């Protein structure tokens, strides 16, 4: 109850912080003012602050007074999106074409709020808490930058949070197992031979072969992949040809590949190349497949999930807890931290309960109910407070 009362007392300041961040969004890798603002708040709370971690990231370490060697990290992200805000708010974006349309202003506020609460309890914390304020989540590079600069050194476990407008504010969603998908980039080049549109038998039609490749890939997903292990392959770009009466000799396709299970993720490059090779060899074309690993799936740790569940129940009661039944095929570079320490990410509801529709993330009319701020800060604070008593080494 003491943590909750502290957070409640700080709420006006937290709303002020959130509105400042929302009005001053910065794109991925350009979070200079945001980082300086975050560092200033952390320093005022007495944390040890390191700036320029992961380029524009910030790390704040709160020292407990106990001797427990386990180090808990709490990660939030800071970057905005290249979207023109269409919500008429007194604190709407002041930067044309840039908007906090994914709630990272809320996330940053939650990290700062939790640091503010726990800093007032630091003399009673059994161990240390490290706060990671990450840049460039939207381009899936910030986590790797932070890790390369040592942000995860010594970390035992890590917690993360993401807002979710389809969950009502003042509710928390917990997902056991896979929360989000692995996301990779795919690029395919088809090389045929040009010819007159009236004489296709004298050419190798790269556009037609590309169509066969697309069809073969989609058919193979439904016939050769385990339907209980979801994956999605979406080709969102295709280009080729120079004139309507000339058979194209080159086609480029590009898209995204999403999967939930590590075993499926591991075999995708070879599986895709095999299908492309078979089609192209059948029709005499050459090909090139460029498969670029993005981020793996977020696989939540059961111990950390139970810690979050207990925190929600103790702070807010059973009615505030949702167990999420299905994962998302969206991606989150929080997964990269989980390659270095077990962890869990939860969904924080930001939906307005009195609205028929809450606009989704990445929408120019996305809006978050600020009641979520108290819920998120208290949940993270309770989880951190209980961490050393409930999580095994």
UniProtKB/Swiss-Prot annotation:
Example GO molecular function: hydrolase activity
Keywords from the UniProt entry: Hydrolase
InterPro entries attached to this UniProt entry: Amidohydrolase, Bact_exopeptidase_dim_dom, Peptidase_M20, Peptidase_M20_dimer
Source organism, top-level taxon: Bacteria
EC number: 3.-.-.-
Pfam families: M20_dimer (PF07687), Peptidase_M20 (PF01546)
PANTHER family, alphabetized: METALLOPEPTIDASE, PUTATIVE (AFU_ORTHOLOGUE AFUA_6G09600)-RELATED, PEPTIDASE M20 FAMILY MEMBER
NCBIfam families linked: amidohydrolases
Similarity annotation: Belongs to the peptidase M20 family.
Protein name: Probable hydrolase sll0100
Organism: Synechocystis sp. (strain ATCC 27184 / PCC 6803 / Kazusa)
